[in-house]
Regions:
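Short, amphipathic alpha-helical interaction segments positioned at domain boundaries
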Residues: 134-167
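Intrinsically disordered, acidic Ser/Thr/Pro-rich low-complexity regulatory segments
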Residues: 36-38, 44-49, 62, 66-70, ...
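N-terminal leader segment of winged-helix/HTH proteins
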Residues: 1-50
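Short amphipathic alpha-helical interaction segments
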Residues: 99-114
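Amphipathic alpha-helical interface surfaces
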Residues: 44, 87-90, 105-108
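Short helix->loop/beta-hairpin flanking segments within DNA-binding domains
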Residues: 47-87
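A short alpha-helical element within helix-turn-helix/winged-helix DNA-binding domains
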Residues: 81, 86-96, 112
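Short, cationic-aromatic polyanion-contact patches
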Residues: 73-76, 90, 117, 122-146
């Protein structure tokens, strides 16, 4: 597939690369700044939180379907501790998943533990802490809004451009 040539210049989604690229890059910059401004943590710590969150979500979705509101209630009620028994998430596992040095990962997790955003238990490993919901819920709503806005801002040609990208063999 040639992303540079097309017979019909007016409807060529590949000609929309510049707009699709700009929209995507601005979304990423906005996301980075939102993490920094809203959560006041570094991006690696944010991604560590996402690993902990995804670990719980992965096992939770196997058991039940829950709404946005139910998710926060379950997190607030320490559901992760019950759900993740015998499915522990460790510092070593997070370090391996993110390809971060183990000591860096340990220090960042220690900081999140101190703020009670995360909690470490012998039965369930690293899970969401008592301050996780207050810390993360407002940001998550803004992020969901931002993702929705990003997706809806894409024109049909932008979407075609991304569809074409998926056809390229990497």
């Amino acid at each position: 597939m040639d992303l540079n040539n097309s017979n019909n210049q007016n409807s060529n989604p590949d000609k929309e690369f510049i707009q699709a690229a700009y929209t995507t890059v601005m979304f990423l910059i906005d996301h980075f700044n939102c993490v920094k401004d809203e959560l006041k943590i570094d991006y690696e710590s944010f991604i560590i939180l996402q690993v902990v969150n995804s670990h719980w979500l992965y096992y939770k979705k196997k058991d039940e379907k829950i709404t946005w509101g139910e998710t926060w209630k379950k997190i607030g009620a320490n559901d992760a501790e019950k759900t993740l028994q015998k499915k522990k998430l460790s510092i070593l596992a997070i370090s391996h998943i993110l390809k971060l040095p183990q000591e860096t990962c340990r220090r960042k997790i220690q900081s999140l533990l101190k703020k009670k955003i995360l909690r470490k238990t012998t039965e369930s490993g690293i899970v969401m802490g008592e301050n996780f919901v207050d810390f993360h819920q407002k940001y998550s709503a803004k992020f969901a809004h931002s993702v929705s806005k990003f997706i809806l801002s894409l024109s049909e040609l932008d979407k075609k451009f991304f569809e074409n990208l998926l056809k390229i063999k990497i």
